[in-house]
């Protein structure tokens, strides 16, 4: 490009011109492109190429700033035309996002000056407006068509072939450097560099970068081990494999996802390609076998191998795929969004105490129940990890309606751990065991652990983008749970059914809440990334009379005014900074920590947490009310954000209460699930505590009919009451 500094030796530049979508070009009437002025010999025949319309602009030379290679420069101004000393190719550019078919992707090559370059894509006769097609031009001194807002893409430094399609893969030099580093750090000999190249190629063929998704680190390494085993390759260790991945996918980040105490490392920004063979596996038994689990655990339930022939049909009749195979392939694709490396916790032992067992029930029967129920729960975990939700109904029917009877003798009970999966418990014996209160309480606690593990497997991160097909499958699964269990336990006593259904109902409600929260998060993410919407929200929020909101809400909430003002300022500041959804989540988490800090370790922590949720929701409603009365332009955005933040606050408080009480979130939410069994003693205790605090406040506390927040302004000695 000629300019004031570089002259004719400056690097090559190619202009991408934004253009409206052009109609397809007919196959027969060819359209001749720009006849570019060149330094080629006279009489040389130029080859016409059919293209969408390209506007010819008179040649002009305008001084430009020095442009460096391998960069993208945005050029402001009018119809400026730049002269290029070594032009490669000019391409039409469509600002709308497009998916380029492989047949329309073209490549361009470096060539010496003065040579004629013709680059044409192997596209069909009707060329869409977004296709990348080549231009027949002389290389020497041809004008580049330019316009307002043109993007200049500059040529590379070397003389190697370049692909026009942008990818996040590393260059060959980077891959060679990664191999050299591995050879030095791991002592790998040079003759094994070919093996490393095959590993790198496997990574590039099966994985791609994608924003907003993550993949368990153990899952990716297990896929790699499977590949090495199938192709009889020597795998590198996990640490070296991690270095290899980071050299291929630049900027890859690592996150620790999951609940506190049971989180796993994930690679953030990478996923399986949709066309990867790993997505078409019907039953990844080796992958499941390599999950992190204690060595003493036996092989678990394999539904696709034991109940039907999905696994066999996938390997022998891949040319004729059935709907079941398509569903299995989709499940394999969805497994990257769940936590398949989750370790199933151990169950506690039943506390029988001094309770006398019923007639016909022995301690051997109790131990048999422990073993059989553990295996049943492990089978449930494996079915859910495979996303084969319809097998849950079959599992429950087979467990709670065993064909064996106590008259078959002790052989029907597992006498050892050698064959646990073949062991069954007679139905009448199972009913007798469940009628024992300590056994029923033990089974309830086991269910809390089981269903909490299933929640963490299916939804490891409530804010992470998840395909709508997976979300809908989880919601349909939650909708069917209560009916399946009630049908399977129809012959059991009503008390046993109520206990079991109460826990599974809390599990189903949690799945519905978390999927709704995830849906809100994806909708709000688009709002938080829109600068104009954020500015409008900030403008509307500054018009809200927060002093009036505090006056009205103080009588109900009795919150400390300084805390409310601080939250208001923090909210506006976070909004002004155009924070991401993850940053908002961190701020909400800090609010919960700040408010509940004074109640840490106190028996009143659960009640204080519930009161905070009520007050947060009330204040949010008052702000939304003010925005509604003012006909705020950003009311819709605020309404969406408010729904998301309320749900996420519920999620945070739920987990804080579970951590404080030593229970699982499922157990916390199932505490008041059955309104018929709601004990008023807890409410009485809360009321008694309130009365006791009221009596300590003095006799005039009941006589004054105004809120504490208002009275504190006139009474400087009155202590501030926190949220």
Curated annotation (Swiss-Prot):
Stretch list, region Disordered: 1-46, 292-332, 689-723
Modified residues (Phosphoserine): 28, 416
Biological process terms in GO annotation: acrosome assembly; cilium assembly; regulation of transcription by RNA polymerase II; spermatid development
Predominant location: nucleus
A Pfam family assignment: RFX1_trans_act
Key words, A-Z: Cilium biogenesis/degradation, Cytoplasm, Differentiation, DNA-binding, Nucleus, Phosphoprotein, Spermatogenesis, Transcription, Transcription regulation
Function: Transcription factor that acts as a key regulator of spermatogenesis. Acts by regulating expression of genes required for the haploid phase during spermiogenesis, such as genes required for cilium assembly and function. Recognizes and binds the X-box, a regulatory motif with DNA sequence 5'-GTNRCC(0-3N)RGYAAC-3' present on promoters. Probably activates transcription of the testis-specific histone gene H1-6.
Protein name: DNA-binding protein RFX2
Annotated gene: RFX2
């Amino acid at each position: 490009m000629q300019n004031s500094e570089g002259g004719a030796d400056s690097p090559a530049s190619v202009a991408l011109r934004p253009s409206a979508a052009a109609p397809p070009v007919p196959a027969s009437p060819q359209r001749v492109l720009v006849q570019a002025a060149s330094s080629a010999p006279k009489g040389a025949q130029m080859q016409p190429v059919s293209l969408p319309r390209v506007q010819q602009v008179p040649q002009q030379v305008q001084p430009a700033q020095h442009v460096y290679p391998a960069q993208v420069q945005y050029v402001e101004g009018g119809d400026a035309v730049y002269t290029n000393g070594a032009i490669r190719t000019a391409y039409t550019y469509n600002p709308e996002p497009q998916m380029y078919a492989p047949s329309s992707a073209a490549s361009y090559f470096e060539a010496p000056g003065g040579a004629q370059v013709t680059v044409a894509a192997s596209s069909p006769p009707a060329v869409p407006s977004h296709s990348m097609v080549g231009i027949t031009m002389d290389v020497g001194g041809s004008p580049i068509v330019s316009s307002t807002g043109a993007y200049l893409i500059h040529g590379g430094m070397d003389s190697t072939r370049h692909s026009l399609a942008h990818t996040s893969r590393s260059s060959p030099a980077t891959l060679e450097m990664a191999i050299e580093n591995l050879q030095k750090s791991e002592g790998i000999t040079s003759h094994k560099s070919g093996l490393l190249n095959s590993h790198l190629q496997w990574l590039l063929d099966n994985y791609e970068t994608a924003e907003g998704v993550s993949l368990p680190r153990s899952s990716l390494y297990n896929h790699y081990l499977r590949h090495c085993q199938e192709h009889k390759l020597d795998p590198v260790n996990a640490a070296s494999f991690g270095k290899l991945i980071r050299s291929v996918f630049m900027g890859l980040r690592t996150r620790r996802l999951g609940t506190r105490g049971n989180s796993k490392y994930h690679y953030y920004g990478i996923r399986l390609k949709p066309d990867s063979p790993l997505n078409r596996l019907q039953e990844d038994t080796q992958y499941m076998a390599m999950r992190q689990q204690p060595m003493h655990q036996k092989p678990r339930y394999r539904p696709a191998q034991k109940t039907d022939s999905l696994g066999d049909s996938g390997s022998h009749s891949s040319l004729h795929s059935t709907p079941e195979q398509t569903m299995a392939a989709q499940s394999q694709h969805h497994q990257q969004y769940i936590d398949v490396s989750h370790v199933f916790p151990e169950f506690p032992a039943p506390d029988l105490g001094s309770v006398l067992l019923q007639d016909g029930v022995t301690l051997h029967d109790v131990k048999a129940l422990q073993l059989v129920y553990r295996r049943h729960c492990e089978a449930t975990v494996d079915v859910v990890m495979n996303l084969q939700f319809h097998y849950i109904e079959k599992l429950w029917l087979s467990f709670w309606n065993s064909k064996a009877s106590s008259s078959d003798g002790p052989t029907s009970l597992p006498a050892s751990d050698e064959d646990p999966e073949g062991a069954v418990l007679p139905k009448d014996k199972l009913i007798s065991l469940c009628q024992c209160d300590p056994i029923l309480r033990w089974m309830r606690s086991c269910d809390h652990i089981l269903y909490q593990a299933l929640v963490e497997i299916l939804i490891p991160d409530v804010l992470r983008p998840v395909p709508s097909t997976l979300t809908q499958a989880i919601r349909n699964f939650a909708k069917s749970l209560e009916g399946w269990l009630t049908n399977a336990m129809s012959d059991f006593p009503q008390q046993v059914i109520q206990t079991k259904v109460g826990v599974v109902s809390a599990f189903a409600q949690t799945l519905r809440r978390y999927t709704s929260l995830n849906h809100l998060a994806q909708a709000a993410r688009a709002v938080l990334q829109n600068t104009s919407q954020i500015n409008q929200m900030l403008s509307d929020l500054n018009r809200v009379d927060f002093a009036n909101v505090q006056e009205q809400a103080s009588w109900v909430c009795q919150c400390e005014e300084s805390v409310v003002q601080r939250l208001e300022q923090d909210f506006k500041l976070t909004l002004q900074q155009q924070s991401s959804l993850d940053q908002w989540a961190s701020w909400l988490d800090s609010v919960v920590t700040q408010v509940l800090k004074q109640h840490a370790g106190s028996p009143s922590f659960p009640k204080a947490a519930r009161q905070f949720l009520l007050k947060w929701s009330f204040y949010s409603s008052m702000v939304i009310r003010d925005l509604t009365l003012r006909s705020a332009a950003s009311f819709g955005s605020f309404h969406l954000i408010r729904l998301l933040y309320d749900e996420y606050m519920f999620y945070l408080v739920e987990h804080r209460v579970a951590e404080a009480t030593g229970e699982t979130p499922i157990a916390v939410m199932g505490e008041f699930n059955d309104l018929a069994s709601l004990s008023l003693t807890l409410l009485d205790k809360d009321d008694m505590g309130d009365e006791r605090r009221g009596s300590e406040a003095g006799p005039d506390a009941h006589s004054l009919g105004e809120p504490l927040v208002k009275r504190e302004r006139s009474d400087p000695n009155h202590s501030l009451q926190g949220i």
